UniProtKB/Swiss-Prot annotation:
Entry protein name: UPF0612 protein P20C8.01c
UniProt keyword Cytoplasm, yes or no: yes
Entry superkingdom: Eukaryota
Species assigned in the record: Schizosaccharomyces pombe (strain 972 / ATCC 24843)
Keywords for this protein: Coiled coil, Cytoplasm
Transmembrane regions listed in the UniProt entry: none
Coiled-coil features, chain-numbered ranges: 27-63, 138-225
Subcellular location: Cytoplasm
């Protein structure tokens, strides 16, 4: 089987790994391709040659027709020139009138055309400007409508915020009143507690005074007890001595 690379290189080189049979087939196909290419070149050359001959004949025919017309027109011009000289009436060439009419007409036509073009341009620009202004006006109007809606919503929100602020202020006032009342109550309770502490302090002072008095009394009692004990002992000693003496 032939390799798939046989025609990938446009017959520049045979595939390097093909067998001898594959190479023969490649050579035959290459020869057929060369013959087909040469035949196509010959056909194109023949068509080009036929076209060249046809164009040459048409050119020669055209040159002959133009020369015949020119010769006839030149002969007619000479005859009319002789006739005008003999009659003494020399006319301006028609091309001058045609040039003047065409020139002036062309100038006015260009002027009017330019004016029409300018008018159309101005109209189109005016229409474009008007459309743009209308579009911008519509946009601005829509934005204003949207802004009015937003402002209305903001007003509603502001009214609600004012109401909420009033409610909060009322609650704050109530809380302040309650707080003030509670502070006054607490202050009164603290004052009462202070008074009780003062009373307790006074009672402690009185108790201290009483304790001091009791201490003094105890000291007096102790002193008296000591004297009583001493007297008792002395009396006992005296009694014992008297008993010894009596014995």
């Amino acid at each position: 089987m032939m390799s798939n690379e046989n025609f990938d290189n446009d017959y520049n080189l045979p595939p390097p790994n093909d067998s001898a049979e594959d190479l023969k087939i490649f050579i035959k196909r290459y020869e057929r391709s060369v013959d087909s290419t040469l035949l196509e070149i010959d056909e194109n050359k023949r068509e080009a040659l036929e076209k060249y001959i046809e164009e040459r004949d048409r050119k020669m025919k055209y040159e002959i027709e133009c020369n015949e017309r020119l010769q006839g027109w030149k002969k007619l011009a000479i005859e009319r020139e002789i006739s005008e000289e003999q009659s003494g009436e020399v006319q301006f060439p028609r091309w001058i009138d045609e040039w003047a009419n065409t020139k002036l007409g062309g100038i006015f036509e260009r002027i009017f055309s330019k004016m029409d073009s300018m008018q159309n341009d101005m109209n189109s620009r005016f229409d474009a400007m008007q459309n743009e202004m209308n579009s911008r006006f519509d946009t601005v109007q829509n934005e204003m409508t949207s802004m009015k809606g937003e402002m209305a919503e903001m007003k509603v929100e502001m009214v609600e915020m004012k109401r909420e602020t009033i409610r909060l202020n009322t609650r704050i006032d109530l809380l302040e009143q309650k707080t003030e009342a509670r502070f006054q109550s607490i202050e009164q309770r603290f004052n009462s507690i202070d008074q009780r502490f003062n009373s307790i302090d006074r009672r402690f002072d009185s108790m201290e005074q009483r304790l001091d008095s009791m201490d003094q009394k105890m000291e007096t009692i102790d002193a008296r007890s000591c004297r009583s004990i001493m007297l008792t002992r002395k009396l006992e000693n005296t009694t014992r001595s008297d008993q010894g003496y009596l014995a």
